[in-house]
Amino acid sequence: MAMDDYDDDMSSVGVTTARIENQHQQHPHQQGQHGHHQQGQGQSQYSAGAVKVGGWRYEDASRYIGEWNQRGQKHGIGHLQFADGTRYDGQFQEGLSQGVGCLWFADGAKYEGEFHQGWFHGNGIFWRADGMKYEGEFRGGKIWGLGLLTFQDFTHGFPRNEGFFQDCRFMRRRRCPEVVQRAQKCALMARSQCEHPY
């Protein structure tokens, strides 16, 4: 069988993510005394009445340490830890992951790269817990665009697929070294961004 004829179960990568957010979009200090987000505990530093940097532990056991905007939303650099062990370190904008960041899943999978409105979006690298690695373009939380998919072993047939992916499915072969390099650069920027004092 020629590589161009290759078609197996792994033409579908199986990477779809939930939007990186939790139910706590706002800092509890911005709500009224009986506001919905008042559960939890934390400490913050204030500047002219607005929360700038602080930490908060929510009732559902998730935690956030980082920067906030004047409306009480996660905004700037921060660390968000969910109760299941999933962790995001990186940039936030108005309560959602936005910019570059690193996301570690409880099952051992991880993503380093660009985010847009809470989704993997742009360029980055995703490692699945079984050793599969995708370096390339993402859209709306899915593998979508040009990229390189590799496996640590031959359990899924050919050890690499390079080309165009749509909705997590391998569509056609195409060399794309410039896209892979861009994904590697974004992942490196995300890793360096995650090295913060929180």
Curated annotation (Swiss-Prot):
Retina. Expressed primarily in the phototransducing compartment of photoreceptor cells, the rhabdomeres and its expression is dependent on ninaC protein (at protein level). SUPFAM superfamilies: Histone H3 K4-specific methyltransferase SET7/9 N-terminal domain. One of its GO terms (biological process) is visual perception. InterPro entries: MORN, MORN4. MORN repeats lie at residues 64-87, 88-109, 111-132, 134-153. phosphorylated under dark conditions and is dephosphorylated by light exposure. GO terms for cellular component: cell projection; rhabdomere; rhabdomere membrane. Residues 23-46 are annotated as: Disordered. Pfam families: MORN (PF02493). Residues 23-45 have a biased composition (Low complexity). The keyword Hydrolase does not apply. SMART domains: MORN (SM00698). The modification N-acetylalanine is found at residue 2. It is a peripheral membrane protein. Keywords: Acetylation, Cell membrane, Cell projection, Membrane, Phosphoprotein, Repeat, Sensory transduction, Vision. It is found in: Membrane; Cell projection, Rhabdomere membrane. Disruption phenotype: Severed rtp null axons show significantly reduced and delayed axonal degeneration following axotomy whereas wild-type axons degenerate within the first 24 hrs. Rtp-null mutant flies exhibit age-dependent impairment in the termination of phototransduction in the retina. Photoreceptors show a conspicuously high level of spontaneous dark noise. Interacts with ninaC. Plays a role in promoting axonal degeneration following neuronal injury by toxic insult or trauma. Organizes rhabdomeric components to suppress random activation of the phototransduction cascade and thus increases the signaling fidelity of dark-adapted photoreceptors. The rtp/ninaC complex is required for stability of inad and inac and the normal termination of phototransduction in the retina. PANTHER family: MORN REPEAT-CONTAINING PROTEIN 4. This is MORN repeat-containing protein 4 homolog. The gene is rtp.
